[in-house]
């Protein structure tokens, strides 16, 4: 990219490192940022820096938050006896958009994938098992319906069954290989309502 200044080239290169942003999209974003008013660029840069410096894991469910406990875990209006296990914070947000689920969550931050070298110790399973020491009555497994998601669901089910806690899996309706964050709210709600015991 010798036809751009080194500063523009550097911005395009950094933007293209973001997931889902190819070279052309990075170029469009770079030129858009450059054309923005300075104050707006500073707010954007500040928001990114603040998020990076202040966002952490909720100490209970491991979603991303800027407080010790996320708003869901700290809410007395939620059913803390029901835990929905999801792969990532985006999946949690997808279920929250339905407005119907009133339990709490546990975010694994991944799924078991032997092909990628991700085992049970690489995701938040130990922390899930520690949470089950309380008054939990049901664990709803809402991992993606991919091979990795199904593997993770079966592994979790085998871990929890001996405890006597009810273990359910969201119903199909979520397409095989589908990522929850891209599924519409009605489909997610039907999958939740049609969950089955494992």
Predicted segments with their positions:
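Cys/His-rich Zn2+-binding cysteine-cluster or related metal-binding knuckle/ribbon modules and their
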Residues: 2-8, 17, 27-92
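Solvent-exposed alpha-helical segments within well-ordered globular domains of core cellular machineries
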Residues: 9-13, 27-31, 42, 46, ...
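Conserved phosphate/pyrophosphate-binding and hydrolysis machinery centered on Walker-type P-loop NTPases
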Residues: 19, 38, 51, 63, ...
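Extended interfacial segments that mediate partner engagement and assembly in macromolecular machines
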Residues: 26, 75-143
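Core recognition of P-loop NTPase motor domains used across DNA-transaction enzymes
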Residues: 40, 45-48, 59, 71-72, ...
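Long C-terminal interaction/binding lobes of large macromolecular proteins
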Residues: 129-198
């Amino acid at each position: 990219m010798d036809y751009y200044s080194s500063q523009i080239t550097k911005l395009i290169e950094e933007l293209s490192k973001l997931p889902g942003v190819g070279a052309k999209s990075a170029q469009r974003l770079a030129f858009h940022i450059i054309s923005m008013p300075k104050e707006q660029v500073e707010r954007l840069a500040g928001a990114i820096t603040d998020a990076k410096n202040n966002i952490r894991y909720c100490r209970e469910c491991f979603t991303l938050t800027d407080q010790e406990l996320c708003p869901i875990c700290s809410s007395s209006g939620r059913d803390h006896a029901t835990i929905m296990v999801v792969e990532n914070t985006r999946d949690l947000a997808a279920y929250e958009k339905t407005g119907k689920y009133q339990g709490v969550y546990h975010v694994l931050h991944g799924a078991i994938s032997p092909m990628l070298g991700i085992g049970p110790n690489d995701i938040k399973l130990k922390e899930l098992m520690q949470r089950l020491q309380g008054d939990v009555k049901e664990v709803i497994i809402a991992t993606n319906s991919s091979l990795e998601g199904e593997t993770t669901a079966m592994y979790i089910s085998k871990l929890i069954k001996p405890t006597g806690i009810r273990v359910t899996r969201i119903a199909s309706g979520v397409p095989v290989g589908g990522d929850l964050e891209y599924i519409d709210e009605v489909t997610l709600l039907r999958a939740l309502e049609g969950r089955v015991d494992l």
